[in-house]
Swiss-Prot record:
Biased composition (Polar residues): 10-20, 68-90, 108-126, 279-292, 303-317
Residue sites binding Zn(2+) per the record: 437, 440, 458, 461
Chain positions of Gelsolin-like repeats: 972-1044
Name of the protein: Protein transport protein Sec24A
Key words of the record: Cytoplasm, Cytoplasmic vesicle, Endoplasmic reticulum, ER-Golgi transport, Membrane, Metal-binding, Protein transport, Transport, Zinc
Length: 1099
């Protein structure tokens, strides 16, 4: 029988909030119906205030990750302890206390000769200090290990090429971090069209102990997710309820204290933390035979995200819509455990997954199409309902039974989330009853089990719950008595319209405040013209409704406010020169209703760029301006967009230059940590008042982004960086700013959000990565959520999962849409539990592992040093491959033997070592390195991997063979090439997609056809040195090339600039710098790196 939708065990923290925009009530409890398993990229409706058109697909099918500053005073932040409410925590902080299914960890890091990253173990980590240099705070582990596993690893030495110092010291990248959530996507009817979904494993018959107050023994088949075994939930292990009731909501209340607002934990209560006073008996889960492989439906090249073919029109009444029939009725024969076992006996794992590869002999392992995530080894009926890996992804798709087994594998266990991703199809439920577990507060999901029509068992804590009367009726089929066919139980990603008990106050209106630097340096760059024009062009597209408010502040050595009160003939400037004691003049006229004062707003935007053209003021009072903006927004909350062009020089928050160009390569001398805690403290105040701060830094000089970035990191904001911005001297940056502003201003947004991740009893979350503040042990505060933000979490196995066959993770994002609706977006992921090392390696997701390690390495760079982080990355490869060689390989062979799943692990780690965040040498300016680290912490995984390991294509011979079709466009799909000059030829043209930049290298002997039909020049010498756009020519070659580049650019958080590079162009050095497999001035080639790894593994 089908299993209703209780949230799967908490996994990665992903924003589960629904997209902005009210759902249109159509008389049925549900609005816009979902399309079966179509939870990929989505298009957002114009009515929601977002961009009406979203890109059709990502070039890679990986959840992206957003940039997150690290906790503490560092930009990339180290872990911090979570303390009482008053003490805020930011990304990359360790959680302390009794979180739901969380594991306490010790954040202290001891520096030492051999830095390591221990993984958390089942014992109390607080009792055991972490090994020196370890990334992961947590319990001590007996065996040596990497930062990934929360245990110590042995020292390894890695020789470096040329000037590169040798990599010594054992480093582990396992440190706690917190994840934040993203914005919601387009809502769709929960009504689906298409064929019925296959039956999910029904629950096994359960025998109840005498006296159990839960009624007669249930009948039916085995639960699809978990076997029914009685397990006692102790206060230590039981997850706490988190979302329901007024006392359990995902919201935050602010009270006044000493003149400022203080955040209280009420949102924690709304989301649901804590258990009911009355204990409820739970039943044991009989062991169920292991489910076997089902693979995701194949996706077109380039991970095309398109809606399923037969999407039913939203205008049709529920009765006329064809929702896939879920599990069979209870009267039918259930799919029991015996049936499952026999049906799976003939299945076997794909032989390719068991291949052992010698990387020294098989070096060309990079696939020619985008790398797809591994498919969990689950029964087909369960896998069909699983969460899309673009939204929710685990580093290990087979969860080890014990922490000892995880430690033995020496691979990091964690989740990567893209919770608020734009979706084409999103089921939205408008029912007044949200069904949740009464004990752990998990939302009903496809992986719960129905004992009968009146009771369901939670797949996270195993409590048996009653099915509410309203849940018995299925509005899609208009049939009573089919709770297992409800949308909540048929969709791993779903959005709920939250009732009043999920609100601590009326939903806040959309409030947008813009803070502009108007000093002489700022006016010289000319940025104000571009920003004001972009605002004018997109004013009507700002997400919101009739309550939308807007305001403006400018500053140099003083602060300027602008009264936009309705009835004024023109905006009035109010100047506050006392920056030591900032006050708000006429606060009621500074944030005004956009609809009522639109003409005044437009007048101000047209005149602002000219108002300061003759200014001679060179000072910058950024700190006081931020304080003023915070005071202005405190009563309502909202989004603050700050534009800064230089180092702050006046008042609180003033900074001094710290960069020394000659010491850029000195890992111990570079300043990756903040020089003041002012910006972090202010960010925490902002978070408490539901204010997020987005920073746009446009500067040609050092501006201490390590310090300034804290204002966004801890308030769940974003950082945008435009080095050497100038409207005349650097026009390409002007184009980039305008494109990114257009997306920034019009994308959907969620306000006053909180996110919580739950997981099956026995697993615990100990570290979050991303831009947010950890309000209480496991509740992430997100004043704003957006669809371009990614998050990651680290986990450990706290209790043995021996009696558990399946585990689940569930993230819940509660937020207010731009239309003023309170919504909850829930993602649930189900994975199998395994008992052998081979199975753990078989299910390893190398991209997710690399993304999590990158986040941990950023923290290590800040808390220890850049060299420690680099060593830890190398040791991550050495330790895992050593574990495989010693424990999983039946016979020892010469060479570097790796399991097929990890064949790209050394390549991706080498790419990380050469990425701007971690590379050595004097090429990278300090602010550029810090910004790269911000991107690692805040970008979804798909973009992080593109930035780390770019995709290289040959484009002078594009054809329609193998092309995909998106919205009547034909998109060529050239094969992906290895990043080595061996793959280049002077008679071709090669395009490199590095995420935030595109580079088109044209060989000196490139064919005349490409030059004339695509570039529009007669010969090679006529290619402009500064060409950044391709001409739109009326030729098939031009159309194919432009279509391919446009497709790559779609739906990127950052607009990728295109550089056309001639063979002798200065930009060629940047192009070759991304050739990861080749030797550079300070890094080994891929083959040399493999030899080093082999030497260490064979020791």
């Amino acid at each position: 029988m089908s299993q209703p939708g209780i949230p799967a065990s908490g996994g990665s923290s992903t924003g589960l909030q629904a997209q902005n925009g009210a759902a249109s009530a159509s008389g049925s409890p549900y609005t816009n119906g979902p399309v079966q398993n179509a939870l990929m990229s989505s298009q957002v409706s114009v009515s929601q205030g977002y961009n009406s058109q979203l890109p059709g697909s990502y070039p890679h099918l990986i959840p992206a990750k957003t940039l997150n500053p690290v906790s503490g005073q560092s930009n990339s932040g180290g872990s911090q302890t979570v303390s009482p409410l008053s003490n805020y925590q930011g990304p990359g902080q360790a959680l302390y206390g009794p979180p739901v299914a969380s594991h306490p960890v010790t954040p202290s890091l001891h520096s030492g000769p051999s830095p390591q990253m221990p993984l958390p173990t089942s014992q109390n980590p607080a009792a055991t200090p972490m090994p020196s240099g370890s990334f992961l705070p947590g319990a001590s582990v007996s065996s040596p290990s990497n930062w990934q596993y929360n245990y110590l690893s042995q020292t390894n030495h890695c020789p470096r090429a040329s000037s590169q110092p040798t990599m010594t010291g054992n480093t582990n990248l396992m440190s706690p971090q917190y994840v934040s959530s993203g914005d919601s996507s387009l809502q769709n009817n929960i009504i689906k069209s298409g064929s019925a979904l296959p039956l999910v494993n029904p629950p096994l018959p359960t025998t109840f102990q005498p006296g159990a107050p839960l009624g007669p023994p249930p009948t039916g088949g085995p639960p699809p997710v978990r076997a029914l075994t009685p397990q006692k939930l102790t206060p230590r292990t039981m997850p706490q309820p988190s979302f329901n009731s007024t006392s359990n909501q995902e919201g935050i209340i602010s009270n006044t204290n000493n003149g400022s607002m203080v955040v209280h934990n009420n949102y924690d209560e709304i989301e649901g933390g804590g258990f009911l006073a009355t204990s409820q008996p739970t039943t044991k889960n009989p062991t169920m035979s292991r489910s076997v492989g089902y693979s995701y439906p194949s996706l077109p090249p380039g991970y095309q995200n398109t809606a399923p073919p037969s999407t039913t029109g939203a205008g049709l009444p529920p009765s006329s819509l064809n929702y896939p029939s879920g599990p069979q009725a209870f009267t039918q024969t259930p799919l029991g455990a015996n049936h499952l076992t026999s049906s799976m006996s003939g299945l076997s794992l794909h032989p390719e997954g068991l291949r052992v590869i010698n990387l020294l002999q098989e070096r060309n392992m990079l696939p020619s199409t985008p790398l797809q995530p591994p498919v969990p080894n689950l029964h087909e009926d369960i896998q069909k309902l699983n969460c899309n890996p673009e939204l929710f992804r685990c580093t290990l798709t087979s969860i080890p039974q014990t922490q000892a087994l995880l430690n033995k594998a020496k691979l990091p266990l964690g989740l990567l989330l893209h919770p608020f991703k734009d979706l084409v199809q999103l089921p939205v439920v408008t029912s007044s009853t949200i069904v949740r577990c009464r004990s752990c507060r998990t939302y009903i999901n496809p992986f719960v089990s129905f004992l009968d029509q009146r009771r369901w068992k939670c797949n996270l804590c195993y409590r048996v719950n009653d099915v509410p009367e309203e849940f018995m009726y299925n509005p899609l089929t208009r049939v009573y008595g089919e709770p297992h066919r409800r949308p909540e139980v048929q969709n791993a990603t779903i959005e709920f319209m939250a009732p009043s008990e999920y609100m601590l106050r009326p939903p806040q209106p959309p409030v947008y405040l813009f803070v502009f630097d108007v000093s002489h340096n700022a006016i010289e760059t000319g940025y104000l013209n571009s920003v004001c024009q972009s605002l004018l062009d997109n004013l009507d597209l700002l997400p919101g409704n009739t309550r939308t408010k807007i305001g403006f502040i400018t500053f140099d050595s003083t602060i300027h406010f602008y009264s936009l009160q309705e009835g004024l003939s023109q905006p009035q400037m109010l100047i506050v020169s006392d920056i030591e004691d900032v006050f708000i003049p006429m606060p009621e006229n500074l944030l005004v209703n956009l609809n009522e004062s639109k003409e005044l707003v437009q007048d101000l935007l047209k005149t602002l760029p000219q108002m300061f053209t003759k200014t001679l003021e060179t000072q910058s009072a950024l700190g006081p301006a931020l304080q003023a903006a915070f005071k202005l927004m405190s009563p309502t909350g909202g989004r603050m967009s700050v534009f800064q062009t230089q180092l702050p020089t006046l008042g609180v928050g003033a900074l001094k230059p710290r960069e020394e160009p000659n010491q850029r390569s000195s890992a111990k001398e570079i300043h990756l940590t903040p020089s003041t805690d002012f910006y972090k403290k202010l960010a925490l105040d902002c978070s408490g008042q539901q204010v997020a701060v987005d920073l746009f830094l446009l500067s040609g000089q050092y501006s201490d982004l390590a310090s300034l970035g804290c204002i966004s990191r801890y308030s769940a904001g974003s950082v945008y960086y435009y080095p050497s911005y100038h409207h005349q001297h650097n026009p390409i940056q002007v184009q980039k700013l305008e494109k990114e502003l257009q997306r920034y201003l019009t994308r959907k947004i969620g306000f006053e959000a909180v996110m919580r991740i739950r997981c099956t009893k026995g697993l615990s979350i100990h570290t979050f990565h991303g831009n947010f503040f950890v309000r209480s042990t496991d509740l992430l505060s997100l004043p704003n959520v957006n669809p371009d933000a990614g998050y990651a979490v680290q986990m450990s196995v706290e209790e043995s999962l021996t009696d558990t066959q399946l585990v689940s993770f569930q993230s819940a994002l509660l937020y207010t849409s731009s239309k003023g609706e309170r919504r909850i977006r829930v993602h649930t992921l189900c994975l199998p539990v395994v008992s052998t090392l081979n199975e753990v390696f078989l299910g390893a997701d190398v991209q997710a592992i690399s993304g999590l390690l990158a986040n941990m390495a950023v923290d290590r760079s800040v808390t220890a040093s850049l060299s420690d982080a680099r060593d830890a990355l190398v040791n991550a490869v050495i330790d895992s491959l050593s574990a495989y060689r010693s424990s999983a390989l039946s016979n020892q062979q010469p060479g570097l033997m790796v399991p097929f799943s990890l064949r790209l692990f050394p390549l991706f780690v080498l790419a990380l070592l050469k990425q701007k965040s971690f590379q050595t040498g004097t090429n990278a300016r300090l602010d550029e390195r810090i910004f790269a680290m911000c991107q690692v912490k805040n970008q979804p995984l798909v973009y992080l991997m593109l930035t780390t390991h770019p995709s290289l294509y040959r484009v002078d011979n594009l054809s329609d063979e193998g092309a995909i079709s998106i919205n009547d466009r034909t998109i060529p799909q050239p094969p992906i090439l290895q990043l080595s000059v061996e793959k280049l030829s002077r008679d071709g043209a090669f395009l490199m997609d590095a995420g935030s930049v595109l580079m088109l290298w044209v060989g000196r002997n490139c064919g005349q056809n490409f030059l004339s039909q695509v570039l529009g020049v007669e010969n090679y010498a006529l290619i402009p040195q500064t060409m950044t756009d391709l001409p739109e020519l009326d030729t098939p070659e031009s159309a194919r090339t432009i279509a391919f580049i446009s497709w790559l650019r779609e739906q990127r958080p950052f607009y990728p600039i295109l550089y056309v590079i001639r063979d002798e162009s200065p930009m060629k050095a940047n192009f070759l710098q991304n050739m990861v497999e080749d030797r550079t001035e300070s890094a080994l080639s891929y083959y040399e790196f493999l030899l080093h790894i082999q030497q260490q593994v064979n020791k």
